[in-house]
């Protein structure tokens, strides 16, 4: 997962070449079912429309390095279906939740807020979903998903200020000023410079700001209908995430 703007060799190697290696091995070994975890970012954005599943994937139709490589990889999966592989695709939205020690950007957002490291938040939001619901949906796709079909595993749109309000109701904290996206863009070079000096990834990028204002009206009706997918309210997700973080690290009470 990356919020970088440019496609790197590492992204191509992991997201595209790595996926094709797995597909080739699965086809050669005649595996019973192959489930590919794509992303809603791989789905071409159509402004003002509810976005549902598609079989049209192209890096030229999506924005950002991560989205482009996931679109390329998803296209590969559907090519292997035509070769005889029993494969299905799931498209999670913005994943958040406990038990993720991989450096998840949204978990880091929650952590930084609780530790009083966020000076402000940005106007905008996205569709955020619990990692446990994504896991359950992926397992259901393995059991019930139809060959060659795609399933969106989303929840609903939450404004960033709404997410932080939930965090505040669980863990306390102060209200943050909400910056317009244009102001966050002006500060972007400074944020990237500070992150580079500290040898840390930037808090946000041009691409992550784009996602906060993009169309995130994803429909999970198909997954609910065919897989029994039922995403939970984000309050439960954030409550459990903070409880997990407090067991893992000494967060402020």
Task: Please provide the spans of the model-predicted regions.
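Conserved catalytic-site region of short-chain dehydrogenase/reductase
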Residues: 3-4, 39-50, 95-99, 104
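NAD(P)-dependent short-chain dehydrogenase/reductase
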Residues: 83-89, 93-127
